[in-house]
């Protein structure tokens, strides 16, 4: 009988704490560049008319429609410069230009696309990314990276085992060769979240996020929630007009672990999460603030809210990758508490005043106060 009771207690404890399991996480079954996602396998010369690709299936592994060009990076006629930092070739989507590829996935799972995109002419340019039933149109703003080529992430939930990933230029310009430049596309399965024992915040260390290109990264822009309902940064809501930037340890300085977020657009760049609390209970909130060792400098301040209670953590950045951690106490006034973080100021890089940067946020932890 004692053995029976012991096994029963063990099973009960396992069920109660299953969401805090310390078992190793499985590896995402997809995490890399799509077939010819860097466009380095080029069309036959017979399928080219100048830069324009002729024929729906002429670009290996892709299907095209409308005006699509194959271009090389570097200086261009007219004084433009095309940034292609991860290779030699890219595609430019002219008026109503489209490229698409069928990708094998698993129905019901969440995936994130990471892609490099920039505008190629002076006027406003957008790029629409979609899978069947889900789409987003992103404005291309060359103010977040010093080389003019930004990287974006967009997430979706697979509704079948094969999805058609499509990139489309919805614009019609007088110069039909204007349009967004797409230089690389990758996909990653976003694993389900698990709580870290003792922390009420999911993915508080930003360890789960989109695919990061190994050979070159300026950070990955995560669009606002008003544009995306499924986040490539799970657990978090980008609830601002401007995106936040996901950064990794390989290319930037982050306070802890492998990932963090950079709040790149002042009060217009906010990130939030709703956590479960008990009304009337006291909690401790801690988080780290620093710089990404990317030349972002000056007096920084991250403002935070736990429900309606405000907190401020200041940090003087010399652009060398330092950080500090703040600890704050709050009392929950409901069973759900919204945590919100944003930069109080706007910042630019020390030697590049034309591009925005900001404080790094990492290691967000909420525990019951003792």
UniProtKB/Swiss-Prot annotation:
Pfam families: DUF642. Expressed in primary and lateral roots, stigmatic papillae and hypocotyls. GO terms for cellular component: extracellular region; plant-type cell wall; plasmodesma. Glycans are attached at residue 215. Induction: Highly induced during the M/G1 phases of the cell cycle in the meristematic zone of the primary root. Induced by auxin. Highly and early up-regulated in roots during root-knot nematode Meloidogyne incognita infection. Keywords: Cell wall, Developmental protein, Glycoprotein, Secreted, Signal. It is found in: Secreted, Cell wall. The keyword Transmembrane does not apply. 'Teebe' means long in the Mayo-Yoreme language. Prevents hypocotyl epidermal cells elongation by modulating the pectin status in cell walls. Likely regulates pectin methylesterification degree during cell separation and elongation, including upon root-knot nematode Meloidogyne incognita infection. This is Protein TEEBE. It comes from Arabidopsis thaliana. The lineage of its organism: Eukaryota, Viridiplantae, Streptophyta, Embryophyta, Tracheophyta.
């Amino acid at each position: 009988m004692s053995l029976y009771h012991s096994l029963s207690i063990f099973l009960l404890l396992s069920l109660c704490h299953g969401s805090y399991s310390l078992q190793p996480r499985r590896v995402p079954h997809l995490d890399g560049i799509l077939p010819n996602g860097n466009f380095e396998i080029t069309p036959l010369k017979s399928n080219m008319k100048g830069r324009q690709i002729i024929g729906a299936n002429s670009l290996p592994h892709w299907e095209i429609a409308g005006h699509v060009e194959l271009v090389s990076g570097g200086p261009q006629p007219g004084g433009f410069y095309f940034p292609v930092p991860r290779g030699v070739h890219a595609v430019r989507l002219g008026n109503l230009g489209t490229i698409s590829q069928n990708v094998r996935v698993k129905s019901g799972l969440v995936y994130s696309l990471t892609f490099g995109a920039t505008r190629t002419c002076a006027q406003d340019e957008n790029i629409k990314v979609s899978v069947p039933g889900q789409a987003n149109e992103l404005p291309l703003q060359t103010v977040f990276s010093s080389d003019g080529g930004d990287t974006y992430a967009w997430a979706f939930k697979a509704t079948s085992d094969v999805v058609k990933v499509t990139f489309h230029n919805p614009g019609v310009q007088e110069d039909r060769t204007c349009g967004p430049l797409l230089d690389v596309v990758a996909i990653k399965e976003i694993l389900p979240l698990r709580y870290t024992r003792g922390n009420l915040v999911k993915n508080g260390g930003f360890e789960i996020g989109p695919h990061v290109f190994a050979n070159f990264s300026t950070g990955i822009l995560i669009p606002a929630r008003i544009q995306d309902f499924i986040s490539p940064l799970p657990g978090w809501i980008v609830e601002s007009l401007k995106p936040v930037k996901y950064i990794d340890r390989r290319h930037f300085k982050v306070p802890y672990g492998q990932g963090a977020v950079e709040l790149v657009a002042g009060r217009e760049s906010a990130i939030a999460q709703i956590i479960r609390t008990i009304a009337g209970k006291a909690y401790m909130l801690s988080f780290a603030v620093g710089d990404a060792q990317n030349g972002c400098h000056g007096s920084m301040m991250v403002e935070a809210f736990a429900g309606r209670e405000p907190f401020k953590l200041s940090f003087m950045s010399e652009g060398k990758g330092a950080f500090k951690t703040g600890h704050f106490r709050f009392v929950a006034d409901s069973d759900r508490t919204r945590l919100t973080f944003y930069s109080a100021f706007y910042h630019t890089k020390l030697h590049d005043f034309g591009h925005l940067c900001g404080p790094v946020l990492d290691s967000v932890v909420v525990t019951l106060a003792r």
